[in-house]
């Protein structure tokens, strides 16, 4: 099945403690159904000091379920993603506006 959300997409969080926050997808794990969004679902990780790393408390974005994310369309509103065949190629389409993503 084709991916509805991809790396670089602007998304909004629909549920959870970060509801309403917007960000860009930095990585997607389709097999786990999760994505990492910049600035969303931040956790503090304690790292030990080493020669290359200073150590301490480091904020790190954690994965979030794809079902809890919605793509932002050109108007800045959350939209669902559909697919359409154009010129023999399968393209992603915003359901609210019908624009090709």
UniProtKB/Swiss-Prot annotation:
Transmembrane segments: none annotated. It comes from the Bacteria. One of its GO terms (molecular function) is rRNA binding. One of its GO terms (biological process) is translation. Keywords: Ribonucleoprotein, Ribosomal protein, RNA-binding, rRNA-binding. PROSITE patterns: RIBOSOMAL_L24. InterPro entries: KOW (IPR005824), Rib_uL2_dom2 (IPR014722), Ribosomal_uL24 (IPR003256), Ribosomal_uL24_CS (IPR005825), Ribosomal_uL24_KOW (IPR041988), Translation_prot_SH3-like_sf (IPR008991). One of its GO terms (cellular component) is ribosome. One of two assembly initiator proteins, it binds directly to the 5'-end of the 23S rRNA, where it nucleates assembly of the 50S subunit. PANTHER family: MITOCHONDRIAL RIBOSOMAL PROTEIN L24 (PTHR12903). HAMAP family: Ribosomal_uL24_B (MF_01326_B). Belongs to the universal ribosomal protein uL24 family. Part of the 50S ribosomal subunit. This is Large ribosomal subunit protein uL24. The gene is rplX.
């Amino acid at each position: 099945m084709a991916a509805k959300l991809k790396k670089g997409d602007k998304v909004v969080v629909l549920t959870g403690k970060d509801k309403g926050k917007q960000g860009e997808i930095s990585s997607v794990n389709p097999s786990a159904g999760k994505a990492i969004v910049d600035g969303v679902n931040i956790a503090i990780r304690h790292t030990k000091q080493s020669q290359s790393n200073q150590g301490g408390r480091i904020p790190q974005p954690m994965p979030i379920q794809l079902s809890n994310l919605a793509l932002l369309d050109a108007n800045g509103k959350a939209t669902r993603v559909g697919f359409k065949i154009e010129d023999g190629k399968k393209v992603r389409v915003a359901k609210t506006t019908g624009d090709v993503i």
